[in-house]
Amino acid sequence: KVIKALICAAKNGNKVTVVIELLARFDEASNINWSKRMQDAGIHVIFGVEGLKIHSKLVHIGTRHGDIACVSTGNFHEGNARMYTDYTIMTAHRPIVREVNAVFDFIEKPYTPVNFKELLVSPNDMRKRLIALINKEIKNKEQGKEAYILAKVNHITDQALIEKLYEASATGVQIELVVRGNCSLVTGIPGISENIHINGIIDRYLEHSRIFIFANDGDEKYYIGSADWMPRNLDNRIEVLAPVYDKEIQADLKRIVCYGYRDTAKGRIVDGTGENRLWKGFRSTLCKGSTPAFVEADKTNVLFRSQEELYKEYKNTL
């Protein structure tokens, strides 16, 4: 549907540029076919950057009334949309929109020096800025200020980030993570990672979103985007994390992470044992029972299934 809409836009006289990554697992043939159809419709199709796989999910729309940008955690793929949990932010915030456009410029003219202030972009500066965000939490904790990290990712295997999280934990920063897949971080090591706790969810839908929350001494910083904490995402791919400033959306993102962290029905303990034991009972210093679903689960001591609870809540608001 997205591709057909782009083709329709081009046929209606709009200038359309599409960046498509041909090296997508299991979708190479489909991507080649759709690329030809878009080119036949007059769309300018770009096939990525040599040496850098494009993994970011971005849209930039120019209108007479102002430009709009979208940054997503998931692909524009109808099959994935039925099976994956993902989130997209659509914004007219001018600094973010300008920088999303700059990412497209970078893709068209690769290795051109580009500076980003709003977006965290790989391979430009994402690693450096993530480490800076963690360092800020360490510094705040040392100064007696509020400091914690909440995050939801697919994988954590980057050694430099893992070492930095260990340093934060050793300083006393509380770190609560939802990690669905590969995790090289070992929790519960005395003096090193005893302040890090990880829940992993395997349920009906594939957990695919990436959400990052930093306490920042009470003025929380929120980011969503395409990047996991892996060397390939930080060094060898074009990835984008975007800040989220809207308080209502921030609250929703925090609820998503906390629901995942508090899942006692499909959540498993991610630690060094590899036993994948299920969580039993509530355990969190950051995700306390502030929603009706949490309160009811605590009161009745029933299993809390995050995907089911989120589905019901979203369904009731539509």
PLM feature spans:
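Gly-rich Lys/Arg/Thr-decorated short loops/hinges at beta-loop-alpha junctions or inter-strand turns
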Residues: 110-119, 144-146
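PLD/PLD-like phosphodiesterase catalytic module centered on the HKD motif
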Residues: 2, 8, 12-83, 90-97, ...
